[in-house]
A protein has these predicted regions:
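Active-site histidine-anchored catalytic micro-motif
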Residues: 1-136
Length: 136
């Protein structure tokens, strides 16, 4: 059996945000065994799984990605939406637009320190739409 839910997250500031609880609030009862596919419908934000216990991880992600892919690169052509836009597309392509999480005993089978992240790469990204597909 397959269920699908489309929902919007509230607007987040630029950075990395743990959204595990927000995602779970959108889902009905999970099957005993299955998989959750989570897809973001945007090209300047991403979803990933990473450590959710230490807030320094969030800050370090932002610092590293901004060091590797800075704004205001003089050779970028796609700049009409702002200097943060093209770097946001590149960062989103690197991290990706979807994740898969196993469902075991009716719960997401995440590791002890793992959480679902929204990676917001725009200064003013706005509400982000996600599609959650639960396959049992």
């Amino acid at each position: 059996m397959t269920s699908q839910y489309e929902f919007s997250l509230p607007s987040f500031s630029r950075g990395y945000h743990v959204i595990t609880d927000l995602v779970m609030k959108q889902l009905d009862d999970l099957p005993d065994v299955g998989i959750l596919n989570l897809f973001i419908k945007h090209t300047s934000a991403a979803v990933t799984i990473n450590e959710s216990a230490d807030p320094d991880v969030l800050a370090d992600f932002e610092s590293i990605f901004n060091h590797i892919i800075p704004e205001n690169l003089p050779f970028l052509k796609h700049t009409m939406e702002g200097t943060d836009d093209m770097p946001a597309h590149i960062k989103a392509a690197i991290i990706g637009c979807s994740i898969q999480i196993p469902i075991t005993n009716g719960r997401l089978n995440l590791g002890t320190w793992q959480g679902i992240y929204l990676c917001e790469f725009r200064n003013l990204g706005g509400a982000r739409k996600l599609v959650a597909t639960v396959i049992s």
